[in-house]
Regions:
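Short solvent-exposed coil/turn linkers within tandem alpha-helical repeat scaffolds
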Residues: 28-36, 65-77, 87-88
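Start-of-helix register in tetratricopeptide repeats
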Residues: 1, 35-38
Length: 90
């Protein structure tokens, strides 16, 4: 749980790189946690704040394709991020 909360705190503080690292560690340690979709979305959202522009579309499409049986909320949010970042050709 510490990695989850640390990631959330970093995200709120707009420390996006640190948030992505903490949340990715959480996902690695707890791949079956019920918050996996939430943390994966936060990682993607964080990446849009710090990743080089030429990598963002790849990150977002990989995130979309990574999730098995995504919720409607997940699908809508990741699609929104893809569209917002002009990744429609991905």
């Amino acid at each position: 749980d510490a990695h989850y909360w640390l990631g959330r705190i970093y995200y709120i503080q707009k420390k996006y790189s640190e948030a992505a690292i903490a949340l990715a560690e959480f996902n690695t340690l707890y791949p079956d946690d019920k918050r996996l979709q939430e943390t994966t979305l936060l990682i993607a959202e964080s990446a849009t704040k710090f990743a080089p522009k030429e990598q963002i579309c790849g990150i977002l499409t990989q995130t979309r394709d990574f999730m098995t049986n995504p919720s409607t909320k997940f699908t809508k949010r990741i699609t929104s991020l893809i569209n917002k970042n002009n990744c429609s050709g991905e």
